[in-house]
UniProtKB/Swiss-Prot annotation:
Native source species: Homo sapiens (Human)
Domains as described in the record: Tne N-terminal domain is necessary and sufficient for basal body localization and ciliogenesis.
InterPro entries in alphabetical order: ENTR1
PANTHER family: ENDOSOME-ASSOCIATED TRAFFICKING REGULATOR 1, ENDOSOME-ASSOCIATED-TRAFFICKING REGULATOR 1
Region (Disordered): 136-185, 225-251
Sequence positions bearing Phosphoserine: 18, 147, 243, 247
Gene Ontology BP annotations: cell division; cell projection organization; endocytic recycling; positive regulation of cilium assembly; positive regulation of protein localization to cilium; protein transport; regulation of cytokinesis
Descriptive protein name: Endosome-associated-trafficking regulator 1
Entry similarity comment: Belongs to the ENTR1 family.
UniProt note on tissues of expression: Expressed in the colon (at protein level).
Bias kind Low complexity: ranges: 240-250
Effect of residue 190 to A: Disrupts interaction with PTPN13
Superkingdom, natural source: Eukaryota
Subcellular location: Cytoplasm; Early endosome; Endosome; Recycling endosome
């Protein structure tokens, strides 16, 4: 991916946390070779000053979703803590217990103090003790002494970079701070500085580059290398082609001015590119986060639907199981009823066979009765004639007896009347005797 080279095996968060921001004295020593992310000039200071009293204000935006995914929302680089957000939208980070106001007023390496001690240092010290070789600059960049000399980059850094001696012993303080912050020894370098030391960058593509290329196009992540050449080499024209050999202070001023302007331009360009990349990555991250939240909500909805469906299927399964059990019970009952019906049918068949035998017997009896009916009729007629004759004899005898009874009844009536009159006859006789 064109733009800034990534170290292999380092995520964007670990790269942001591996930024090595030096303290103020070491910062002024190594500012000629170590790039800063943001440089703020104090008010009322000359813009073309080679040492314009840079006040380090670390501006590196790390999105909160990335910190939340890692579980770390507190920056702690070395001894410092992240302060509240500045009006420009960046986080102004204070490192250690130093204050920017104190550094601006009582900094022995400010431009004001430098002008006071410049003439004395140039007159008393040897030029060899003032300007170190490339080994010192390489050591200030954190490179090994065994690494090959730096190659020419795209920013015109092919000359030897000066390293000014620290009269107050700030280098020892820097070494002590580097020993204390061994966990943050790695330094973030833009592609221009990293290309000057290609041995430190492996040939393979890091996982971070594939991660960023997934969300951004190569044109969006283009670094300072894709900028026009006039923006990078504009400050070269400000360097005077020739300087008086007998005025080392003028040579040093011109050299420092060109160096400071070049670094200011390159750092401003790299800062703008990083800011654009940061905003694009922030937008991409917001989109990815919203998409992830939508997908998570969709997954939760699908899980709820799946759970409801599973509960419904389980209830349906229990209902179906109960129905199957009921059907099995009904089948058992029907089987028992079928067995009973078969037994009843067998009994009915036996009864039918008995009834058929009885019917056959009755038919034979009817036939026998029909055959013997003619002989019985003649006998019956004869018996009826005899009975009629006997009845006639009885009737005749009955009439004669009836007549005798009627005559006897008349005699009986006469006797009854005579008996009634006997009482009267006796009473009359009694009356006659009394008289």
């Amino acid at each position: 991916m064109s733009g800034y080279q990534r170290r292999p095996g380092a995520t964007p968060l670990s790269r942001a946390r591996s930024l090595a921001i030096p303290d103020a004295p070491a910062f002024y020593e190594r500012r000629s070779c170590l790039p800063q992310l943001n440089c703020e000039r104090p008010h009322g200071r000359d813009l073309d000053s080679p040492f314009f009293g840079i006040r380090p204000a670390f501006m590196c935006y790390v999105p909160s979703p990335v910190l939340a995914s890692v579980g770390d929302t507190d920056f702690g680089y070395g001894k410092g803590k992240c302060s509240k957000q500045s009006p420009s939208g960046a986080h102004g980070t204070h490192f250690g217990d130093d204050r920017f106001e104190d550094l601006e007023e009582a900094n022995p390496f400010s431009f004001r103090e430098f002008l006071k001690t410049k003439n004395l240092g140039l007159s008393k010290e040897d030029p060899a003790s003032r300007i170190y070789a490339k080994e010192a600059s390489r050591h200030s960049l954190g490179l090994d002494h065994n690494s090959p000399p730096s190659q020419t980059g795209g920013y015109g850094l092919e000359y030897q970079q000066p390293f000014f001696e620290d009269p107050t012993g700030a280098g020892d303080l820097l070494d002590e701070e580097e020993d204390e912050d061994t966990g943050w020894s790695g330094a973030y370098l833009p592609s221009a500085i990293e290309q000057t030391h290609p041995e430190r960058v492996p040939a393979g593509t890091s996982p971070c580059s594939t991660y960023l290329s997934f969300f951004s196009t190569p044109s969006e992540l283009a670094g300072p290398e894709s900028l026009p050449s006039w923006a990078l080499s504009d400050t070269d024209s400000r360097v005077s082609p020739a300087s008086p050999a007998g005025s080392p202070s003028a040579d040093f001023a011109v050299h420092g001015e060109s160096l400071g302007d070049r670094h200011l331009r390159t750092l401003q360009i790299s800062y703008d590119a990083l800011k654009d990349e940061n905003s694009k990555l922030r937008r991409k991250l917001n989109e990815v986060q919203s998409f992830s939240e939508a997908q998570t909500e969709m997954v939760r909805t699908l899980e709820r639907k799946l759970e409801a469906k599973m509960i419904k299927e389980e209830s349906d399964y229990h209902d179906l199981e109960s129905v199957v059990q009921q059907v099995e019970q009904n089948l058992e009952l029907m089987t028992k009823r079928a067995v009973k019906a078969e037994n009843h049918v067998v009994k009915l068949k036996q009864e039918i066979s008995l009834l058929q035998a009885q019917v056959s017997n009755f038919q034979r009896e009817n036939e026998a009765l029909r055959c013997g009916q003619g002989a019985s009729l003649t006998v019956v007629k004869q018996n009826a004639d005899v009975a009629l004759q006997n009845l006639r004899v009885v009737m005749n005898s009955a009439q004669a007896s009836i007549k005798q009874l009627v005559s006897g009844a008349e005699t009986l009536n006469l006797v009854a009347e005579i008996l009634k009159s006997i009482d009267r006859i006796s009473e009359v006789k009694d009356e006659e005797e009394d008289s």
